[in-house]
From Swiss-Prot:
Positions annotated to bind NADP(+): G165, R166, S167, S190, V231
Gene3D superfamilies reported for this sequence: Leucine Dehydrogenase, chain A, domain 1 (3.40.50.10860), NAD(P)-binding Rossmann-like Domain (3.40.50.720)
SUPFAM superfamilies from the UniProt entry: Aminoacid dehydrogenase-like, N-terminal domain, NAD(P)-binding Rossmann-fold domains
Entry protein name: Bifunctional protein FolD
Membrane-spanning parts: none
Length: 284
């Protein structure tokens, strides 16, 4: 058995076509969705990610504003810029590219962003609302994963979802989103003994730890859905996920590739949140 590939690239293309229509309708109503992106320092990966986000914004008709700062910027100057953007009527979403330099507190930055412009879904108010099932901006990668699984026609209710990883950005929130869809959720992490004994119970396995090819076929229940969030660069320059794709696809029922899996959906959910923020702010 060879797993069916869940292509985030194809799924994202379909969703972005619909988002472009929504953005065009907002423009026709006098509202041009705007996303402000703040980039601190000269990390090549961060610059690459931001470039991809700006390109995606242009594709669907979202105006993007890029603000770059040197790595030595002091925290208060950065927070002052965010406060300025919070009240800028042309800006509907604010994204601060992470990670930030060590001398800047990420939580101070995240908490300074107005919750109604927090299109990354990281603000404690949005996280809290997500936890209790209220309407909120959902974090982009977990939301993208949920949409991928649903769009593939996979029933979630009653399934055992195992999450490998417990980060605030992916691991913790993705489990909550699947719990809301009536899955039974188990979290695993670096301190979990006998990881394979637990992952082999998973109907849906979500891996987000940043360790190349951590998960092999011995971790997989035959026919399981395997979602690989990891992006790792090998010594030969090639990208790979946290899952040994070639080996695992012979056991799994569905699997996401790296690249071309979760990544395109993460950016697509950012676009979705920005357009939704523009719609909500325009209605006020």
């Amino acid at each position: 058995m060879t797993a069916q590939i869940i292509s985030g690239t194809e799924m994202a293309r379909t969703i972005r076509t619909a988002l472009a229509d929504e953005a065009a309708q907002l423009k026709a109503d006098g509202v041009e969705p705007g996303l402000a992106v703040i980039l601190v320092g000269d990390d090549p990966a961060s610059h690459s990610y931001v470039k991809g986000k700006q390109k995606a914004c242009a594709e669907v008709g979202i105006r993007s504003f890029l603000y770059t700062f040197p790595a030595a910027i002091d925290e208060e100057t950065l927070l002052a810029k965010i406060r300025e953007l919070n009240v800028d009527p042309a800006v509907h979403g604010i994204l601060v590219q992470l990670p930030l330099p060590d001398h800047i507190c990420e939580w101070s930055v995240i908490e300074t962003i107005a919750p109604e412009k927090d299109v990354d879904g990281f603000h404690p108010i949005n996280v809290g609302k997500m936890m209790i099932g209220q309407r909120a901006f959902l974090p982009c990668t977990p939301h993208g994963i949920l949409v991928m699984v649903q769009s593939a026609g996979i029933d979630i209710a009653g399934k055992h979802v195992v999450v490998v990883g417990r980060s605030n950005i992916v691991g913790k929130p993705v489990g909550q989103l699947f719990l809301r869809e009536h899955a039974t959720v188990t979290y695993t992490h670096s301190k979990t003994p006998d990881l394979a004994a637990i992952t082999r119970q998973a109907d849906i396995l979500i891996v987000a730890v940043g360790k190349a090819r951590l998960i092999g076929p011995e971790h997989i229940k035959p026919g399981a859905v395997v979602i690989d969030v990891g992006v790792n660069r090998l010594e030969n320059g090639k990208l790979c996920g946290d899952v040994d794709f070639d080996a695992v696809k012979e056991v799994a029922g569905y699997i996401t590739p790296v690249p071309g899996g979760v990544g395109p959906m993460t950016i697509t959910m950012l676009l979705h949140n920005t357009i939704e923020a523009a719609r909500q702010l325009a209605a006020k």
